[in-house]
């Protein structure tokens, strides 16, 4: 066994002394994934993937299964926690230049895509009104693909409309994808330890490192305790805070909800999709809103890794963060002025961040007189 793997086995991996709390979200994500797999298994034991019984089986789990309400709420709110952690994790990677560890960043972006797919399939399973219509709207975007679109949509649905075969295959995919996520997470962690994690200064920390255990394990445990407390508080006192009222009604293909809305963690992508008044253009923008993260390591031009000493880039980054929140907010509103205009401007600003990133780096190099 190589020396590095032996160190990893005993938690003795050398880590920079100056990594901050923003580096704790990796271990929090690992905890979230374990929680999701465990609660998901116990829910799958009682769930029935049939359009006539799915909604009733969720009610049965909540009312009749011992601690079923706890499992169901932990799984649903745990998914929201997962996305809160992953968005902060990505933001930290963008701010501190962690994306320059290319293999780790690319595997992480692939993980995000897999996670979003898993969450989408999971949202359809209760077969509530919003579950059904969200599935209809999002899968229907495949028809925008020239030549192959209609065939692919029919193949995905298992028929000419969303029906029992669709629910069955979505359940199968929702069950199998987390195992792929766990495998890729292991690869993500191994690739990270090939080079070692970055630090807030963005400098080489080889001269100042400490063992991961006990120093950073206790630091991680503090944040894990806080996250667990927050999760249990929401589960106990505000279990429906992230739920859509429409999803408490059984799916009815004959009644369209007044306002179509996916889960809150997809709203930024949905807002970008809605901001473009063209089906194919919207579908491409939706895909690019995630895929554009893959370009970041290849467009970095600054001689400095972290944004800590780059005030212009800091302003750009926090504008990007505000834009993300604005798109999320506009996606909850009806498709009418002024919300359409706001979402279009915000969507443009979202993509401009990734264009400004290399330009600002080049300008900073000129100002600092780097060759």
Swiss-Prot record:
Cell compartments where the protein resides: Mitochondrion inner membrane
Signal peptide (UniProt feature, chain positions):
none
Q: Which cofactor does it need?
A: heme b
GO terms (molecular function) for this protein are: metal ion binding; ubiquinol-cytochrome-c reductase activity
Q: Does the keyword Iron apply?
A: yes
PROSITE patterns xrefs: CYTB_CTER (PS51003), CYTB_NTER (PS51002)
Principal cellular location given in the protein's record: mitochondrion
Q: What more is known? A: Heme 1 (or BL or b562) is low-potential and absorbs at about 562 nm, and heme 2 (or BH or b566) is high-potential and absorbs at about 566 nm.
The protein, known as: Cytochrome b
């Amino acid at each position: 066994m190589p020396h590095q793997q032996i160190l990893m086995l005993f938690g003795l991996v050398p880590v920079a002394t100056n990594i901050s709390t923003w580096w704790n979200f990796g271990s929090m994500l690992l905890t979230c994934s374990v929680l999701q797999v465990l609660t998901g298994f116990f829910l799958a034991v009682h769930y029935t993937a049939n359009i006539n019984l799915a909604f009733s089986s969720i009610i049965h789990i909540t009312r009749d299964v011992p601690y079923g309400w706890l499992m169901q709420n932990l799984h649903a709110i745990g998914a929201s926690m997962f996305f809160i952690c992953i968005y902060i994790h990505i933001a930290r990677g963008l701010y501190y230049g962690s994306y320059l560890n290319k293999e780790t960043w690319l595997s992480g972006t692939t993980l995000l895509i897999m996670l979003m797919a898993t969450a989408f399939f999971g949202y359809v399973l209760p077969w509530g009104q919003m579950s059904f219509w969200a599935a209809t709207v999002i899968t229907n975007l495949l028809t925008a693909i020239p030549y192959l679109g209609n065939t692919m949509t029919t193949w995905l649905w298992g028929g000419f409309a969303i029906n029992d075969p669709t629910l069955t295959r979505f359940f199968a995919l929702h069950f199998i994808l987390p195992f792929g996520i766990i495998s890729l997470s292991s690869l993500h962690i191994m690739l990270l330890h090939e080079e070692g994690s970055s630090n807030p200064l963005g400098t080489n920390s080889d001269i100042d490192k400490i063992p991961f255990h006990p120093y950073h394990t206790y630091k991680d445990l503090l944040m894990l305790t806080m996250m667990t407390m927050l999760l249990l508080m929401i589960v106990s006192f505000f279990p429906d805070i992230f739920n859509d009222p429409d999803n408490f009604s059984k799916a009815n293909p004959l009644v369209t909800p007044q306002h179509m809305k996916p889960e809150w963690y997809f709203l930024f992508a949905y807002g970008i999709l809605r901001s473009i008044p063209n089906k194919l253009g919207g579908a491409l923008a939706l895909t690019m809103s995630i895929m554009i993260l893959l370009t970041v390591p290849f467009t970095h031009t600054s001689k400095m890794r972290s944004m800590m000493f780059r005030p212009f880039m800091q302003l750009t980054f926090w504008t990007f963060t505000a834009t993300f929140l604005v798109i999320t907010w506009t996606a909850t509103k009806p498709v009418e002025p002024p919300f359409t205009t706001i979402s279009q401007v915000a969507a443009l600003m979202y993509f401009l961040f990734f264009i400004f990133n290399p330009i600002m780096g080049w300008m900073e190099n000129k100002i600092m007189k780097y060759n």
